[in-house]
Amino acid sequence: ENYTPKILDILQQKHVPATFFVIGLNIENNIPLVKRIYNEGHEIGNHTFTHPNLEITSDDRERIELRSTRLLLESILGYSTVLFRPPYNTDAEPKNLYQMRSLAVANNEDFISVTSFIDPNDWEEGVEADSIVARAIKNQKAGNIILLHDAGGNRSETVKALSQIIDYFQKHGYTFVTVSELMGKSRNQVMPPVQKQLQFTEKLDYIFFFITFIWEHFLHGFFLVAILLIIFRLLFVALMAVLQHKKEKKQENQPGEFLPLVSVIVP
């Protein structure tokens, strides 16, 4: 939400297409942004719903993750996706049986797994834009897909690095394309439109998700206002207490102001 719009602005300015692999939870919380990604000509892939480590996730859990995210995309955009990028280490190259198993599950769900070898590790804490650019350039011969992150933490350095990465590779004869074009396919082939007989159901799903989106943002704003009012009330009470304390102190220090009653008893 904080960095994706800035990245989209840069891509639009540079006339560069990209493929965004999105998490279901982020889709649910950023419906207008997901629409913007698609409407500006980019592609969207599945990155599971909650970003679990698929090496230690059951097959059934993975299927639910993939299907939920796909259903959410279909209900919002009217288009599905066959592109899938697994979370964590599996996104580069499977190195063990568990990683292979997770890719097999995705394949059985009719997904095409997309991996990446040019990974500048922009997610590392404290990494600077210059380092991200240098790593991308250093590994340019390792593959043909550059992996960058727009969520999951502070991505301000990624935003700074993006323009430099684009400028360098274009200057050296590279052309940026989407994953579908890299595969020799069209966007509609990797993001096929929802079948007509399912469109009514998808519209109902969209209405439900949109109401949920509005409600969550309303609650967020409501609680924020409530917290601010509580803080304001506490500050007001504290201020009044300080003023009252000063007033009482001032009265104590003024001689002759206080004249208590005196009773005289004559036997």
Language-model region placement:
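Active-site beta->alpha N-cap acidic-glycine motif
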Residues: 1-81, 86
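Hydrophobic beta-strand scaffold residues
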Residues: 18, 44, 112-113, 176
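Catalytic domains of cell-wall/extracellular-matrix polysaccharide-remodeling enzymes
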Residues: 28, 52-168, 174-175, 181, ...
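Short beta-strand/turn micro-motifs at beta-sheet edges
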Residues: 32-33, 40-42, 134-135, 250-254
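Juxtamembrane amphipathic/hinge helix adjacent to a transmembrane helix
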Residues: 172-210
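N-terminal membrane-anchoring/stem segments of glycan-assembly enzymes
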Residues: 195-258
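Cell-envelope/extracellular polymer assembly enzymes that use nucleotide-activated donors
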Residues: 260-263
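Active-site beta-to-alpha loop of glycosyltransferases that engages the nucleotide-sugar donor
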Residues: 266-267
